[in-house]
C-alpha cells in the first residue's frame, strides 16, 4: 500500500462487500461516506489481530453514483466499541477492498494504538507485539513509534502481573493463618472457654419469663491449655455449662471487660461460634481497574472567518439599510478576493457577520446560494417586492447613484442573470452614442451571451478609457483647469501674442478692428471656455477651425490693439516714436528687418491667434518686448540715414 500521502484511495468492489456483509448476517448495504473498522484476524504477518480504518466513496461531488467506487484509508486508531466493525482474514477482505494492507505505525494495534492497556478488555487481551515480518516492512521512524507504543503496553501488563502476585501472596498468608488454628497455641481466631460461675456472682439476674425453661444441664467443657488438645476440638456444637437459678445475661467478652478474671479462662460463647461460622471467607480486594478511554475522533476544524481583514477591505456597512444591498453587491468581488467563499453556509456567516446583526437583514443559508440571491433578498427586504417590468426604474436609480457598472452588476443579480433584459435596459443609460457603438462592437466579437455577460464590465471600462471618461462615465476634463503653454515657434501653432512696438495705425490696412469683430471674438472665447466646463469626450480640439465656424479672427487682423488696451502699464513704460515716412508702404516693410511679433506681418502671423491675458504668457512677452524694441531702434536709424542721402 502506498504511504506517500495522508489520504490514500483505492478501488472498491461493492458486490463483494455486500457478500461479505451477508455472510456475517448484516442485512444492509454499504453507505456513501461510511467509516468502517476492519479487524484483520490473520495475514502475511501471521495469525495475529491487526486493525485498519477505511471510508467508502460511492458518489461524486454532485451526489451522482461513481462508475468505479473507491475507498480511502483513514489514518486514525480503530475503536471497536463505538465503530461498525468487519472481521475476517486479509485475503477475504481484499476481495472487496483491493490493495488492502496494514496501516502505518502503531495504528495497526487498533484500540491499543494510544498505548493504554485495559484489563479485562477482549481486544487488549488479544494483544501481540509486532513480528519479524512486520518489522522488515517498516521504516526507521515507523519502527521507533511502534516500539515506543509496545513498551508502554508491556509496562502496564508487568504492573498488573506484579499486582496479581501481591494478591496471591496475601491469599496464601490467610490460608496459612486458618490452617494454623488446628495446631497448638491460641491463634488470634481460636475459640476460648467460658469463665467460672464465680465470675458471674455479682451480676444482676434477669427475671424469669413464664413458659420458658432453662436449657438442660450438660457436663462442663474442658478448657484448652497450652500443650493440651481439647477433647471437643472436632465438635462443632459444644455443650454449654448449666448454671443453677434463673438465666444469666449474656456478657460481651473483650480485653477491657472488668468482669473477665483471666484471659486464659474466658468462656466460649455459642453465639460467637455460630456468628463466626456464618462469616464468609475473605474476598480478595479487586485490583484497580484501568478504564479504557476511547480516543475520540478529531473534531472538525470549523472555518475561521477573518472578519477584521474583510472589514478592512470593504469598510463599514452603511447605516441606511436601503443602501446595504448596493454596498454588498459592489463589495462581493472584494470579499471573494480576500476570503474565497465556497459554500452557502460560509457565505451566510460572512454576510451576517459583516452586517452586524441588523434587524430584519439576517440571512439563512437558503438565501445565500449565490451572491446574486443574497443581494436580491436584501434588496427585496429593504425596498420591497417589485415587478420585473419595473426593473428599469430600479436600474435607473442605481445608475444615478453608483454608475453604469454597478447598475449592471446589481441588475444581473436582481434579474437572475438575465443578460438580454439587463443589457437592453443599460444600453439606454450609456453616456453617448460613441460609447454605445464602441461597446456593441466589442460585445459582438464574443461567442455567446454568457461570455458577453462576464466581460461586459471589462469592455465598458476599456471604452471609457479610450474616450477619456472616468468610471462613472463623466469627462475627466471637467475637473482639470486648462493651463496655456508658451510656444517658441512663430508658425500657426503659436498661441501667445507678443506686444507690438510700433504705433497702432502704422502701415496700410492696420486700422482698429470694429466693435462687432471684437464682440464676436470675445463671444467665441467665452463659448470655448463654456465647452471646457461642460461634459463631453476628451477628443482632439480643432486647431485650424475656419473663421466662419467661430475659429477666430481673419489673417489681416492683429492683436496689437487688444494687447495695448489690456496692458497699459507695459505701453506706458515705452517712449512712443513718430511715424516714419513711407512706413505704410509694402516695399519699405519688406526692406526693413523687423520681427514678426513686433509688426503684424502677413506671412508669420497666426490667423487663429487668441488674445493673451494669462500670467505665464505675460512673462514670456516681457523678454520678447525688449528684444523687439532694440531691433526697431536700429531699423529706424537706418531708414533715417537713407532718407537724408536721397535729399542730398
From Swiss-Prot:
Segments of this protein annotated with the region Nucleic acid-binding: 485-510
Effect of residue 171 to G: Drastically reduces infectivity
Gene Ontology MF term list: DNA binding; RNA binding
Region of interest: GR-box 3: 586-618
Site (Cleavage): 311-312, 339-340, 352-353, 621-622
Record PTM text: Specific enzymatic cleavages in vivo by viral protease yield mature proteins. The protease is not cleaved off from Pol. Since cleavage efficiency is not optimal for all sites, intermediary molecules are expressed.
Compositionally biased residues, Polar residues: 495-504, 514-524, 559-592
Entry superkingdom: Viruses
Task performed by this protein: Involved in capsid formation and genome binding. Shortly after infection, interaction between incoming particle-associated Gag proteins and host dynein allows centrosomal targeting of the viral genome (associated to Gag), prior to nucleus translocation and integration into host genome.
Protein name per Swiss-Prot or TrEMBL: Gag polyprotein
Lineage per the UniProt record: Viruses, Riboviria, Pararnavirae, Artverviricota, Revtraviricetes
Amino acid at each position: 500500500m502506498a504511504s506517500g500521502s495522508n489520504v490514500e484511495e483505492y478501488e472498491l468492489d461493492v458486490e463483494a462487500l455486500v457478500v461479505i456483509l451477508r455472510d456475517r448476517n448484516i442485512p444492509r448495504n454499504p453507505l456513501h461516506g461510511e467509516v468502517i473498522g476492519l479487524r484483520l484476524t490473520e495475514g502475511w504477518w501471521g495469525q495475529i489481530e491487526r486493525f485498519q480504518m477505511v471510508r467508502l466513496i460511492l458518489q461524486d461531488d454532485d451526489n451522482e453514483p461513481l462508475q468505479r467506487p473507491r475507498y480511502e484509508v483513514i489514518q486514525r486508531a480503530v475503536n471497536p466499541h463505538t465503530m461498525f466493525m468487519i472481521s475476517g482474514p486479509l485475503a477475504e477482505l481484499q476481495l472487496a477492498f483491493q490493495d488492502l494492507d496494514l496501516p502505518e505505525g502503531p495504528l495497526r494495534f487498533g484500540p491499543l494504538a494510544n498505548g493504554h492497556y485495559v484489563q479485562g478488555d477482549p481486544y487488549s487481551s488479544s494483544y501481540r507485539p509486532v513480528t519479524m515480518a512486520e518489522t522488515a516492512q517498516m521504516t526507521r521512524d515507523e519502527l521507533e513509534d511502534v516500539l515506543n507504543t509496545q513498551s508502554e503496553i508491556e509496562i502496564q501488563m508487568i504492573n498488573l502481573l506484579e499486582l496479581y502476585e501481591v494478591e496471591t501472596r496475601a491469599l496464601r498468608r490467610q490460608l496459612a493463618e486458618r490452617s494454623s488454628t488446628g495446631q497448638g497455641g491460641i491463634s488470634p481466631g481460636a475459640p476460648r472457654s467460658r469463665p467460672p460461675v464465680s465470675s458471674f456472682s455479682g451480676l444482676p439476674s434477669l427475671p424469669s419469663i413464664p413458659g420458658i425453661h432453662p436449657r438442660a444441664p450438660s457436663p462442663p467443657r474442658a478448657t484448652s491449655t497450652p500443650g493440651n488438645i481439647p477433647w471437643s476440638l472436632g465438635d462443632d456444637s459444644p455443650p454449654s455449662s448449666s448454671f443453677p437459678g434463673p438465666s444469666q445475661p449474656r456478657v460481651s467478652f473483650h480485653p477491657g471487660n472488668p468482669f473477665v478474671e483471666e484471659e486464659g479462662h474466658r468462656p466460649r460463647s455459642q453465639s460467637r461460634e455460630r456468628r463466626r461460622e456464618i462469616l464468609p471467607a475473605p474476598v480478595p480486594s479487586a485490583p484497580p481497574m484501568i478504564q479504557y478511554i476511547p480516543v475520540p475522533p478529531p473534531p472538525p476544524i470549523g472555518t475561521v472567518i477573518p472578519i477584521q481583514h474583510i472589514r478592512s477591505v470593504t469598510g463599514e456597512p452603511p447605516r441606511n439599510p436601503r443602501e446595504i444591498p448596493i454596498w454588498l453587491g459592489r463589495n462581493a468581488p472584494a470579499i471573494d478576493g480576500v476570503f474565497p467563499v465556497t459554500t452557502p453556509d460560509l457565505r451566510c456567516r460572512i454576510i451576517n457577520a459583516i452586517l452586524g446583526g441588523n434587524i430584519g437583514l439576517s440571512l439563512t443559508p437558503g438565501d445565500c446560494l449565490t451572491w446574486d440571491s443574497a443581494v436580491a433578498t436584501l434588496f427585496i427586504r429593504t425596498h420591497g417586492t417589485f415587478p420585473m417590468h419595473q426593473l428599469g426604474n430600479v436600474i435607473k436609480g442605481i445608475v444615478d447613484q453608483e454608475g453604469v457598472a454597478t447598475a449592471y452588476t446589481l441588475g444581473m443579480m436582481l434579474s437572475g442573470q438575465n443578460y438580454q433584459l439587463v443589457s437592453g435596459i443599460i444600453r439606454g443609460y450609456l453616456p453617448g452614442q460613441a460609447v454605445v457603438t464602441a461597446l456593441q462592437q466589442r460585445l459582438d466579437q464574443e461567442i455567446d451571451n454568457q461570455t458577453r455577460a462576464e466581460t461586459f464590465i471589462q469592455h465598458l471600462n476599456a471604452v471609457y478609457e479610450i474616450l477619456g471618461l472616468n468610471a462613472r462615465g463623466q469627462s475627466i476634463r471637467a475637473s482639470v483647469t486648462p493651463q496655456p503653454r508658451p510656444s517658441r515657434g512663430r508658425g500657426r501653432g503659436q498661441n501667445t501674442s507678443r506686444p507690438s512696438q510700433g504705433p497702432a495705425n502704422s502701415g496700410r490696412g492696420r486700422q482698429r478692428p470694429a466693435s462687432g469683430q471684437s464682440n464676436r471674438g470675445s463671444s467665441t472665447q467665452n463659448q470655448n471656455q463654456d465647452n471646457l466646463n461642460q461634459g463631453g469626450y476628451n477628443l482632439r480640439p480643432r486647431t485650424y477651425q475656419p473663421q466662419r465656424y467661430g475659429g477666430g479672427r481673419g489673417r489681416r487682423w492683429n492683436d496689437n490693439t487688444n494687447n495695448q488696451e489690456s496692458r497699459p502699464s507695459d505701453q506706458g513704460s515705452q517712449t512712443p516714436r513718430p511715424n516714419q515716412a513711407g512706413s505704410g508702404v509694402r516695399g519699405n516693410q519688406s526692406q526693413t528687418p523687423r520681427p514678426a511679433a513686433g509688426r503684424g506681418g502677413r506671412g508669420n502671423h497666426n490667423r487663429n491667434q487668441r488674445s493673451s491675458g494669462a500670467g505665464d504668457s505675460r512673462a514670456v512677452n516681457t523678454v520678447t518686448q525688449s528684444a523687439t524694441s532694440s531691433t526697431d531702434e536700429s531699423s529706424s536709424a537706418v531708414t533715417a540715414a537713407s532718407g537724408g542721402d536721397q535729399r542730398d
